[in-house]
Amino acid sequence: MNQVEVKRRQIQSFSYVLACINIWVFGKSIGDNGLGYLAAAVLVFALFWVLTGKNLPDRMGRMLRGRNARGQYRNVSRMRKNMMLFQIAEGLLGTVLCMSLGWILLEKVFLVPYGSMILWILSPALFLRCIQSVFLGYFQSEGSEMPSAVSSVLRQVFFLGLGLVFLGIFRNYGEKVSLLLKRTDFTSMYGAMGIAVGMLLSEVLVLLFVFVIYRGSMAGRREAESGMKGTDSFSSQLRTLLIPMGGDI
């Protein structure tokens, strides 16, 4: 593990500390019931994320780094574009499956009857993260670990700010619903839904961040991609990138 990767992991460890702070802040706001609704939905979301693209940046970075070293810039460009198309399709499929099947885990396994609405809000974040993973994988193939590290910190910062904003909006509405239906748990549930909205919008902002960095490096990349042509087919590229991923899942 080189020094750049060590630095990236250290920054990501700091993002985990921020995540714990976020959990504490939101837990104080929505209580045990609301935190339970949110935790169950996030757990199901994480399961689908592991199955779609969690390991892609590291795998893609290692696979493309060797091709960059051999000057196969056209091959790298084709593989990146093909992987983007594949991840878009996989992200859409994962989102649909998470929204349509995730409620079974929530309501039948975890026995959380109101968690489905939270999961439906979170599910589109799968699609956003799948796209992010391709950009981050390409940055790592260029030897740049900082976009992955910085994005992990920004995700928690955005999540805290947006989560608090939408927590207040949704919780106020939940209080009205609770008074109308005489069910106190609706306040916690709607508060958790607001936090989920903040989480989803955080992924949008992180995607915009990595895309801006990607666009900023396009000029130099186009010059490099005029080099050696690649000969790998689309199917061989997918096998190269995806088959080794199973070992980490």
Question: Model-predicted segments: where are they?
Answer:
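Alpha-helical transmembrane segments of multi-pass membrane proteins
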Residues: 100, 111-135, 161-162
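Hydrophobic alpha-helical transmembrane segments
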Residues: 151-165, 169-220
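Hydrophobic faces of transmembrane alpha-helices in multi-pass small-molecule transporters and flippases
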Residues: 1-21, 119, 123, 146-150, ...
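Residue-level recognition of pore/gate-forming positions within transmembrane alpha-helices
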Residues: 12, 16, 43-46, 82, ...
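Short membrane-interface helical motifs at transmembrane helix boundaries
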Residues: 93-116, 178-182
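Membrane-interface junctions at transmembrane-helix termini in multi-pass inner-membrane proteins
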Residues: 129-152
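Signature of the first transmembrane helix
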Residues: 2-58, 243-249
